């Protein structure tokens, strides 16, 4: 039997899972690692710790499955996106901590570029992205400017840049492969997503030398092999994708209009838009989903800052619950929020608003309002923010959405999933396997290595746990949306 090893390198932990040819999980391993916050707005990882945690997980997963690396048909990689690493080619040693996707240290640089008028609508359409510290370009420029002698060495070809997938593959291959897939590259602000190639004008804008960039490879397909010294055998590296692209693939969103939402600390909603990127008029992100030879799939993406983090605030900020899982029972004590509306703009609002000055607010409180109403309003807010994204995508010409596939920790909350179906007016489908990021990495690699012929062969691997069907009338839906829109408008620009 063939086996596939999926490496799932996330923001707070590294995971590894072994899948068999029937798509069954044979083992799971996880290692947490350290996040550092050296200054306000800065978030860093130790690149060496990322490697140790990920490769230790891989070895643990193989041992737990009772397998040797030589029995693997392929390795697939899914990774936290945008996080930026700069290393020395000769030694493989990182020259500085990795700058994490959440890091905001380059906000002033982005503001300066906007003020100079060099960021145009044409560049936004070329990249599919907003000019924001979230993405890799200004992070890399910061490293080149602040690590001693880095810019000269980068221009001389002595240094390598990569997102976390590149960093992992470099060391997994013993330094023989400096690559990234088109989907990860699309999150750097340096890729023309239409040509799927590095763009000279963007490199010039951010002052990035081409010599530091990785080679672009398909998301699906063998790009090289692991060094036998790492896992004990040379194994084809056959699939690479950013975590949200991998989750979309793992959710089998293979046709245009299909979408998934990951309910984690934040929420990430991706909709397959087919072979053509959609130009958003609602400040959504257009990105490369995955590529295989001449075939390429694009996606429209919206990000919500406060998903499960809203529930964490109920626990840590208000003390309404002791564990996050208790929110469902508390919210279920009341039939609705009793007119209470929570706008969880604690760190501003993400798509489609992109309002950094918005702030969290509770509206509609009366003497009769209690903890259950606030808990219900928190779940409503997660569902309503997702509804905002879906309606923006529809207005951009994507879709229409017929069902929403869900994953992530909060997808286990039945009340939230029912509220989501009611709010969207379409079925919400929860699969049995909620670890869809690792599953997606395995599926990409399995197709790339020939374990599975194509996406049709993956059909048995995605199975439904439960379908939540909408119960609200359109009038109910409209009334809730109107009240939400009023509350959001009141919370905006609060800190401006």
From Swiss-Prot:
Keywords: ATP-binding, Glycerol metabolism, Kinase, Nucleotide-binding, Transferase. It catalyses: glycerol + ATP = sn-glycerol 3-phosphate + ADP + H(+). Glycerol binds at residues 81-82, 134, 243-244. It holds the Pfam family FGGY_C. One of its GO terms (cellular component) is cytosol. Key enzyme in the regulation of glycerol uptake and metabolism. Catalyzes the phosphorylation of glycerol to yield sn-glycerol 3-phosphate. PANTHER family: GLYCEROL KINASE, SUGAR KINASE. This is Glycerol kinase.
